[in-house]
């Protein structure tokens, strides 16, 4: 998106604040419906960040896949759960909660140690549409596929494992 510098920076900071507040709302709101709608807000803001950085294909994929399909599915599943039956068997602390907190704490610690060591000056940000090298959608899609299978193989596999665990959890909740 071709925006002047101060407007671009203001929109970037505003979207960042909405992302942080929306993420906190997803985790902290007691009503699962409100959390699901907050997740939709976060996913839309991520799509707007993609538009701001001239990644229109990723923005469209984000809106169609995550907001249009996954978030609607989450809201649909939450609306069919009976809250009184779900919360009466809930233990305050389980072994899975301990394992999850250890994994999340270790991921947080690794991010905190990795982010300051990253050379952010080597990253080239495209803020103008005339700086995009490839205009052909097929070439851009092929480049995304090549990067997913080479440079971003480990994060791609981690996301697939997270989606598999979420699917198993959804099946376990549906069986109860």
Curated annotation (Swiss-Prot):
- According to the record, the segments passing through the membrane are 10-30, 32-52, 61-81, 95-115, 152-172
Molecular function terms from GO: NADH dehydrogenase (ubiquinone) activity; quinone binding
Q: How does it sit in the membrane?
A: Multi-pass membrane protein
Please name the top-level EC class of this enzyme. translocase
Q: How does it assemble?
A: NDH is composed of at least 16 different subunits, 5 of which are encoded in the nucleus.
The UniProt family comment states: Belongs to the complex I subunit 6 family.
Q: What is this protein called?
A: NAD(P)H-quinone oxidoreductase subunit 6, chloroplastic
């Amino acid at each position: 998106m071709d925006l002047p510098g101060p407007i671009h920076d203001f929109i970037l900071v505003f979207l960042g604040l909405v992302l942080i507040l929306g993420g906190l709302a997803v985790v902290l709101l007691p009503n699962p419906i409100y959390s699901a709608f907050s997740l939709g807000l976060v996913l839309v803001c991520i799509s707007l960040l993609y538009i701001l950085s001239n990644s229109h294909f990723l923005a469209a994929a984000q809106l169609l896949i995550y907001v249009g399909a996954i978030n609607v599915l989450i809201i649909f599943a939450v609306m069919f759960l009976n809250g009184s039956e779900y919360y009466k068997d809930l233990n305050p602390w389980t072994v899975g909660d301990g394992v999850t907190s250890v994994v999340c704490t270790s991921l947080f610690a690794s991010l905190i140690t990795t982010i300051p060591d990253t050379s952010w000056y080597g990253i080239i940000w495209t803020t103008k549409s005339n700086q995009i090298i490839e205009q052909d959608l097929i070439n851009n899609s092929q480049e995304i596929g090549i990067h997913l299978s080479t440079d971003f193989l480990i994060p791609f596999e981690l996301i697939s494992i997270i989606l598999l665990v979420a699917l198993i959890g959804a099946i376990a909740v549906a069986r109860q």
